[in-house]
A protein has these predicted regions:
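Hydrophobic alpha-helical segments, especially transmembrane helices
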Residues: 6-7, 66, 242
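Residues in and immediately flanking transmembrane alpha helices
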Residues: 18-19, 78, 282
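Active-site-adjacent loops and short helices of periplasmic peptidoglycan-processing enzymes
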Residues: 24-173, 177-186
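Domain-terminus/edge residues, biased toward the C-terminal soluble/receptor-binding domains
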Residues: 150-155, 166-391
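Short alpha-helical segments used as structural interaction elements across diverse proteins
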Residues: 2-3, 62, 257
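Structural motif marking the loop-to-transmembrane transition
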Residues: 4-8, 60, 111, 366, ...
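Sterically constrained small-residue positions within well-ordered secondary structures
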Residues: 19, 29-31, 240, 332-333
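Sec-dependent N-terminal signal peptides of Gram-positive bacterial secreted proteins and lipoproteins
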Residues: 3-27
Length: 391
């Protein structure tokens, strides 16, 4: 029987603040759904737009792998593993149940080669082999999964790297945050968008692979994962880019495969029709050049300490204002020293991100001060040398 569910849209936060994001009620929207829980997030801002039973933990089967994928790409980014690393398939990995590409125990493949079946068709044997390579064993990898969850401020608990274990319990909101973090890695979408492919084994035999996410046939969608068991129901994580943002729908425990995709489409369709995303500042990006008093240089650049993006309701863009607040700069200054902030004001509230100077600025010496005074008197720029006048 269909249950009428309501969600509340939430706006305006900085993406790096997860645990203490400001929440402003904008409107309520009703959906007819049979899912146990769902969540809708904008990945750039880490803003939960919609959620029903979002904090309740469930066994979400294959969606557990979202954390495994995140750790794979973080290990690659940190240089802990390399894409060309040789990964040996253990007996434990080869005998994993559920979806697989039927890897043979004792065979070896590159890390990159196994990423494709792990992501594209949620192959449990490939995921386990990669997890063992990253951490030495699946048990050690699970410890990394739980540690990373705590770092992200999440309450989920993992018992395995694949989601086969019913003791892996996650909430829709937690999965939304994990999926948003994973979406930073373009390498993931390289494989999550493949519909059909073939895996060639070390022996030369081939296994046909297919993606269970039917929505990727539509160019709007680019992944992310699915999962199902008789007891947990049908779950999905679906991603789409639009309007400067990336919207991700998490559906847990729906009654059948078509229902999970229908709800995901409705959630993302609502987000695309209603919201836009605007990036105000990029982490490390220069925001402005400001004068410095009593320094060995006359100006210094200031940069944003974090990314700053806002989620806004379409039609309200004109009501968003940006204000740079910086005190008068006086030397000495240290590179990275916070000297002000960018403040964004919108109808729903106010957010800000710190600004820091991009170089050391020493106090000017008597000589440098006299030289600067002389240059000003002669009308010279910072880089002009005094001209020699012929006798």
């Amino acid at each position: 029987m269909n249950k009428s569910r309501k969600f509340v849209s939430i706006l305006l936060t900085v993406f790096f603040v997860v645990a203490a994001m400001p929440m402003v009620t904008v409107r309520a929207q009703e959906f007819e759904t049979t899912a146990k829980a769902y969540a809708l997030i904008e990945a750039n801002t880490r803003q939960i737009i919609a959620s029903e039973n979002g904090e309740e933990k469930f066994h979400a089967a294959g969606l557990t792998k979202l954390m495994s994928y995140l750790l794979f790409f973080e290990a690659l980014a940190d240089g802990k593993v390399r894409s060309e690393d040789s990964v040996r398939v253990s007996q434990e990995a080869a005998k994993k149940g559920g979806t697989s590409v039927f890897l043979d125990s004792g065979t070896s493949y590159s890390f990159e080669t196994l990423l494709k079946p792990a992501i594209m068709c949620n192959a449990n044997d490939a995921v386990t082999a990669l997890a063992e390579h990253v951490a030495g064993s699946e048990a050690a990898f699970v410890e990394l999964m739980n540690a990373r969850a705590k770092e992200l401020g999440l309450s989920c608990t993992f018992a395995d790297c694949t989601g086969i274990s019913s003791e892996s319990l996650v909430s829709a909101n937690d999965l939304a945050v994990i999926a948003a973090e994973l979406s930073k890695y373009s390498g993931f979408f390289k494989y999550s968008t493949i519909w059909l492919d073939t895996f060639t084994h070390e022996s030369g035999r081939e296994t046909e692979m297919s993606n269970s996410n039917v929505l990727i046939k539509n160019d709007l969608y680019d992944g992310m994962s699915t999962g199902s068991t008789p007891s947990s129901g049908y779950s999905a994580a679906i991603s789409a880019k639009s309007g400067g943002g990336r919207f991700i729908a998490i559906v847990i425990g729906d009654k059948d495969t078509s229902s999970r995709f229908k709800l995901a489409e409705e959630l993302i369709g609502y987000a695309i029709a209603t919201f836009g995303v605007k990036q105000i500042a990029q982490q490390g990006g220069k925001v402005k050049t400001l004068p410095v008093a009593n320094g060995d240089v006359e100006e210094v650049g200031v940069y944003a300490k974090e990314d700053l993006s806002i989620l806004y309701k379409k039609g309200e863009e004109g009501s968003i204002s940006t204000n740079i607040q910086v005190d008068e700069l006086t030397a000495p200054l240290q590179k990275g020293q916070i000297v002000g902030k960018i403040v964004i004001t919108a109808p729903e509230g106010e957010i800000s991100v710190a600004l820091a100077v991009d170089q050391d600025v020493k106090e000017q010496s008597f000589g440098s001060g006299w030289h600067r005074l002389l240059r000003g008197f002669l009308g010279l720029t910072e880089y002009e040398e005094p001209k020699t006048v012929a006798p």
